[in-house]
Amino acid sequence: VRYVKVAWEHDFVDEPVLYLSELGGDGYEIRKVQFYRDGRSEWADESHETANSGLAEIPFPPLEEISGQEGLSAEWIDREEFERAWGEAQIDY
């Protein structure tokens, strides 16, 4: 299991600015949290999705590929950082 954080710099009000994902050994998302500029958060796992937050249907791409796109930066994070964000999103829900 690995954890990744992707920041997205943009001017869209209704789009997330930060994504944190838990990835399985096959590269597919197990859980995801996304945060918005206004402080809102949403989350998804195998049993819960929203209209705006769901697990990807394809394996997570290499970090270099993500960070190579304008406005995006990706980095590996530790489990503790992901779990803090996951817990925060659960409280907001």
Segment roles from a protein language model:
Residues 58-93:
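Short, compact, well-ordered microdomains
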